[in-house]
């Protein structure tokens, strides 16, 4: 099998996990392609002598499977690079939460064995696409988790006129607005009171950030509907964050958000159940009285 490997470049203390991964793949005779930035980190900063059959930059690669070793941020970066290639991504967690990258280092050897035995499942995760006339945002307009519209200064709110399929929904007076996929519903959106959505749901969550009204609540819509946003701000600009990567926009910029025409394929072990992950990693439903 041919693997393309992405990793974070700041967790030097956890370098042993990366070394273990390369040894496991070598043991199986894998063809290993490594993101050049990650390879440089392993060789120069960590002094690891790892096998790499090829190095690649950006999205200039092909493989049977992508492996992301790091946290959920590394997984999102890998997903952005994979784009519409249709290559499944396996996430190995050396970060903190590990919701997308949910294979622990202790499970790594067993998981690689399962990959070679074709004993795993692949989940299709929907992606959001942002359409606008801002060339900087169009460099990478796709989000696996969320697209967030946020105020740029620390004092005043922004007004976000929101329409669904051309029909007026409301004008949010808030610090921002988060448009999230089911995958992203357990990320930024959840932290501001958004709903938890099962990953396979064909929906999009719209969640305001610190709204200036008790009557404004999150809303869930069909994922084949189109969202149009017009923003007003005292500073005459605002931030757009696509899976955490932000750009400043002029308030004259109209944003259109819709489901992308491709999905991200996520590799899951058969014993990794979404509801189990909610309970163990987010303590969902935990009762300290018991």
Swiss-Prot record:
GO terms for cellular component: cytoplasm. The gene is nadK. It is found in: Cytoplasm. Belongs to the NAD kinase family. SUPFAM superfamilies: NAD kinase/diacylglycerol kinase-like. One of its GO terms (molecular function) is NAD binding. Keywords: ATP-binding, Cytoplasm, Kinase, NAD, NADP, Nucleotide-binding, Transferase. The active site is at 72 (proton acceptor). It comes from the Bacteria. It is an enzyme of class 2 (transferase). InterPro entries: ATP-NAD_kinase_N (IPR017438), ATP-NAD_kinase_PpnK-typ_C (IPR017437), NAD/diacylglycerol_kinase_sf (IPR016064), NADK (IPR002504). It catalyses: NAD(+) + ATP = ADP + NADP(+) + H(+). The keyword Kinase applies. Pfam families: NAD_kinase (PF01513), NAD_kinase_C (PF20143). Its EC number is 2.7.1.23. Its cofactor is a divalent metal cation. NAD(+) binds at residues 72-73, 77, 145-146, 175, 186-191, 210. This is NAD kinase. One of its GO terms (biological process) is NAD metabolic process. Involved in the regulation of the intracellular balance of NAD and NADP, and is a key enzyme in the biosynthesis of NADP. Catalyzes specifically the phosphorylation on 2'-hydroxyl of the adenosine moiety of NAD to yield NADP.
């Amino acid at each position: 099998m041919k693997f393309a490997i992405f990793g974070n470049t700041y967790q030097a203390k956890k370098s042993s996990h990366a070394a273990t991964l390369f040894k496991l793949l070598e043991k199986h005779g894998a063809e290993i392609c490594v993101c050049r930035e990650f390879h440089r980190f392993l060789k120069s900063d960590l002094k690891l002598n790892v096998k790499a059959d090829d190095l690649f930059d950006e999205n200039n690669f092909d493989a049977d499977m992508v492996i992301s070793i790091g946290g959920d941020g590394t997984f999102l970066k890998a997903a952005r690079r994979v784009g519409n290639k249709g290559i499944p991504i396996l996430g190995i967690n050396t970060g903190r939460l590990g919701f997308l990258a949910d294979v622990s280092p202790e499970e790594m050897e067993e998981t690689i064995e399962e990959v070679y035995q074709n004993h795993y499942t692949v989940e299709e995760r929907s992606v959001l696409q942002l359409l606008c006339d801002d060339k900087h945002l169009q460099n990478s307009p796709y989000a696996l988790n969320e697209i967030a519209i946020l105020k740029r200064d620390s004092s005043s709110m922004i007004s976000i006129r929101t329409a669904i399929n051309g029909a007026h929904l409301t004008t949010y007076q808030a610090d921002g607005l988060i448009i999230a996929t089911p995958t992203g519903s357990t990320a930024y959106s959840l932290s501001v009171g958004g709903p938890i959505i099962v990953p396979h749901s064909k929906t999009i969550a719209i969640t305001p950030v610190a709204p200036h009204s008790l009557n404004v609540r999150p809303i869930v819509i069909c994922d084949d509907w189109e969202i149009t946003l017009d923003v007003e701000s005292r500073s005459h600009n605002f931030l757009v964050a696509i899976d955490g990567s932000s750009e400043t926009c002029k308030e004259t910029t109209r944003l259109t958000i819709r489901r992308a025409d491709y999905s991200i394929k996520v590799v899951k072990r058969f014993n990794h159940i979404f509801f189990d992950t909610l309970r163990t990693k987010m303590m969902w439903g935990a009762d300290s009285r018991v």
